[in-house]
Amino acid sequence: MDYLFFNRQDENEIIVSYCSNIYSLYQKMTEYDVFGASDSFALIQLLKEEERAHPETTNILQELSFSDEISEIYLFFDYDIKQPDAYNSLTIKEQHTRIKELLCYFNDETDKGKLYINYPMVESIRYFKNSLPDNDYKDYTVKAFIDGAFKALVNAESCYKNLDFICFGINKSSDLKIPKDPKKIQSIQDNWITVKEINIKKAHFICVDSYSVPQEKSVISQQHIFDNQLDKYVNPNGRIAILNAFPLFLYEYYRV
């Protein structure tokens, strides 16, 4: 996605793995009083601490001294709802309340950050039972509490058994293996454009029951998507409409 849609000469992009779920983020934000902060400084300090706690990840954030060194912040997390058990003391309502608070807080990438949610998990990026464009994608739902079993479901039901249809390979040095054939590059980019379009349309369907590209992007804001997922899918029948956040990010980032 970076190679295909962003400035490939830009060396100022920072990608950091949080290494936990969205509810852990909420807990850490409470501990660091991030919710009471007026800018992104507290969040960056939190991420720095998490980075130091996971030495296997990059330490690139340690080089930052001030929050104003970062112009935009995007956060991507899975919905990842869980039934209460010995390992999770939060009720379903409490988990939903925390997600809603996070979506309200992270609503501007140029301020404190912009949060995007994958439903139910990031693996939804390849949940297509038919080749693109999958005309049935609008109606795909899964149990809201599917948890890690969704990965197995994607492997079993998706017509794409890997990410090759939208991704380049990686060599031993973790560098992109850019195809030599321009047609292959164009095919991957075209697939991304299709994936973006059908996720935009599905987000619109979730929010207003119209499988079409909305005239206003605000209609399919992350807050509206979440509220309608609960009202139309989770609360009535314990299901969630499959939707991926990365195509929606592309849509909003380019304003088209």
Where are these regions (language model features)?
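C-terminal accessory helical subdomains adjacent to catalytic cores in phosphodiester-
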Residues: E13-V16, Y26-F35, F41, E51-V256
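Short, extreme N-terminal leader segments that mark the start of a protein/domain
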Residues: M1-S24
